[in-house]
């Protein structure tokens, strides 16, 4: 039975028993930055189990894609070398939220395994928690399992908990017996770590809530969470012992062999590559891009490990990206999002391959040299150098060292890392301002509804210290009980404006959160005096706020437009929105084409002209996501979120300030598109009057160019192209004339060659020639003089260019590189090259005649 058939059969089995099929959630957990990746089927139901979310169903079934690489689940070094370690796997699971409990969970599992899949009863074992008599009774008296194949286990292996506190409960695990040909004892025995008895399904019965004291309290509605690895059950159904022998992996291993040129399908490197393409492709599909921290670094580690194993198989060219199509063939039908993202995924992988290829070979040479010393430990300094200079993740170096029976000095590596961090801190140009201590009430924000509000001063800070009052010209931070000022957040700059009281005027230059919920108004007291307890009128700069709103609303339209034009892989990676401009960073692995930029710009302007009402609404995070709201990648949101929608074109979670109608933005212009990091692009744009002024300035510059060309603006590009063609033609003619002139000069100059110990030596200048002509003349002299040493010089714009040549018969004693350095030093320069030809430059043209005159004596001394 194929893996795809098992997956489908599982979903249909539970759907027929009242379960709702829930699609796999992304590998990046929504609204939970504390969890690196989705690593189990229950992750997307976590809030349901905790009672913080309700679903319109009480039974669910899913096939969840999971990644375990990084943190406590980091088994990367084992992947490819054992039968069941993977970075990516699929978890089949059925769930009950306060509906059925132990009895049906066990009976469903037994029916599916023995009925739907036809696994012989005698091949299955079960374990229960030692104190779980209820589960044991169901197995023995309702399922009818042989008592010799039911094991009570008292360890934590059979008691599951989400954390130190919260929902928890006993487990019942189902094992498959691969037979006596495989070593290992039954679960709970001394030899249980062997591979004969393999866990295939874990049934978790959440029936308690553990409090802070550790005491267990029965849950009013017990729930069920189960998980069965698709790869493991496929191995059982296909009667193979290793997951890498199932149909899904066989096709990927064959593809890996094809693109690497490997003939041995049992090679562990092919298993590594086959495993890693699944993890990498799905991580990229779900918005992760290779980087140097967090999820991006885990992806980079997996990618580079796969690349290194290809290198180990002799493949020095990019190959890993070629496997994306093979993966789509195998898994695309079950996960259409992979099919949609195939081009983007392949592009990101290829870019990372090319990036790593620049340093891989040199890094391997350094590592091979270090490993060849015969030491049992690889020094931390070498590990750090490979990491810092050549981009080798530490576990990649450890992987290679382990193949030689060598361990790495992690303590030494950590010492080097700490020293680097200390150096970085010492050389930093800026230091973070010390946080202001504040223990009062939070600031109440009114800025969505008004730009002016009465408030009371709660705290004043001057030079980082709390004070009771401030006077004229004092720079300070003011904390108010209420404010219309927006504090910098989500990429939007803080508001500016003024605070007015009967005794003074405070100019607010910026607004920042000094801690959660507390707004600091930064600026200077322009006149008078202010003290804690004073009443003030807080007034936001209306023009700046309005222009900022134009730009912020435009970023939402831009984000949606980019996803339409470039694809759904585009996600926001950063933004800056202030009164003058907007800057938007997004995931995309190549520079945008000019037509794509225009498409995006036109799409945004079309939405502006539609004059959508900009609607804001407060709702739960889950409701917002269900309505299609875009959330920032990796951001943590509260229980209630603010949703900003512009028609059906853009819906995002956002706490910023916006226009009332999209038409208020007026006009949108993209002024720049660039790369800021691998896989991250940046767009800079203008809106409203600023966009209009930019456009008018461009038109004015075009008119000036057209006037200079004596052409109409619409004909300027064609006229300029003609002029450039003429210039290129004239440059060719000049080069031809220079070459002819050099030929004439060379005929007369060749007679100046001196003979030293049977060798012809010529050192002279050429006038009005470029470097290309200089080289051609050098070759001409060498061909005509046969056994010779030639040095030629020319002067252009007060700079000296030198070239030296030595015929092959003389390079054992006379090196062109040594000669050119000798001459170049005399004219204030330096150079280098091969033994037969070298080039240099200089800054002292007046010294050139004397330098060339010294060549014969140098030749004589070095013969």
Swiss-Prot record:
Residues annotated as binding Zn(2+) are: 552, 556, 654, 658
Q: Which InterPro entries match?
A: aa-tRNA-synth_II/BPL/LPL (IPR045864), Ala-tRNA-lgiase_IIc (IPR002318), Ala-tRNA-ligase_IIc_anticod-bd (IPR018162), Ala-tRNA-synth_IIc_core (IPR018165), Ala-tRNA-synth_IIc_N (IPR018164), Ala-tRNA_ligase (IPR050058), Ala_tRNA_ligase_euk/bac (IPR023033), DHHA1_dom (IPR003156)
- One GO biological process term: negative regulation of DNA-templated transcription
Q: What class of enzyme is it?
A: ligase
Top-level taxon:
Bacteria
* Entry note: cofactor: Binds 1 zinc ion per subunit.
Q: According to the UniProt entry, what is the EC number of this protein?
A: 6.1.1.7
Q: Which Pfam families match?
A: DHHA1 (PF02272), tRNA-synt_2c (PF01411), tRNA_SAD (PF07973)
List the molecular function annotations (GO) for this entry: alanine-tRNA ligase activity; aminoacyl-tRNA deacylase activity; ATP binding; tRNA binding; zinc ion binding
Q: Where in the cell is it found?
A: Cytoplasm
Q: Which PROSITE patterns match?
A: AA_TRNA_LIGASE_II_ALA
Record comment regarding domains: Consists of three domains; the N-terminal catalytic domain, the editing domain and the C-terminal C-Ala domain. The editing domain removes incorrectly charged amino acids, while the C-Ala domain, along with tRNA(Ala), serves as a bridge to cooperatively bring together the editing and aminoacylation centers thus stimulating deacylation of misacylated tRNAs.
Name the HAMAP family on file.
Answer: Ala_tRNA_synth_B
Q: NCBIfam families per the record? A: alaS
- The identity of this protein, by name, is Alanine--tRNA ligase
- Which organism is the protein's source? Nitrosomonas europaea (strain ATCC 19718 / CIP 103999 / KCTC 2705 / NBRC 14298)
Query: What gene name is given for the protein in this entry?
Result: alaS
